Amino acid sequence: MKLGTLAIIGVGLIGGSIGKAAKERGLVERIVGIEPNADSALWAVTNGVVDTVVSEVPADADLIALCVPSDLVAPWVIALADHAAPIFDVGSVKGPIVKAVEVTWSTASHFVPCHPISGSERSGPQAADGDLFDGCTVVLTPLATTASVAEQTCASFWEAVGASVVRMSPDEHDAALAVTSHLPHLLAFAFMGQVTDQHLPLTGGGFRDFTRIAA
């Protein structure tokens, strides 16, 4: 696949990794970032994660990656309703996002909810990794109104950066990830709440692996 302009809203770990993955694989001609944090924006441009940072999505964007907190996804999608490019998010919970979009934009045609099951205990564009999605699974939970061409564009992009794509409903996704991702995080945070300094000399590899989730 070859795109003209990729717009990334939120150039942190995931957004930055999307930019690096696309650039390193020659998938796009230009990467534009929308990043409110001035330090992150400067670092991303200086280090080639994106080509430029602007204040709004350019009209000629061919694909829009929405890498913002889940509660900000729906407002962004609604704001971009008149844009022609496919839009995908990267949130780890899909049901509330889909419902919020459908309430306001009942004919949403180019929004493709996505969840790349990949990440790191690090954050920010400094942690961006062009191979972050290599071998990972990306779940697509398209709306009933999502256009097939938008869905296929997003699926092809994820496959081009090394991911395997699966499709399921938002409810199926959320039920599965509650067990495989959110519960382990909850347990790790609860466990860390019981650890004191006196325990640290008595830890080993299992402690390190388990607590990494809560880092």
Spell out what each predicted region is.
Residues 34, 89-90, 114, 141, ...:
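Generic beta-sheet signal
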Residues 56-82, 86, 90-92:
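Rossmann-like NAD(P)-binding element
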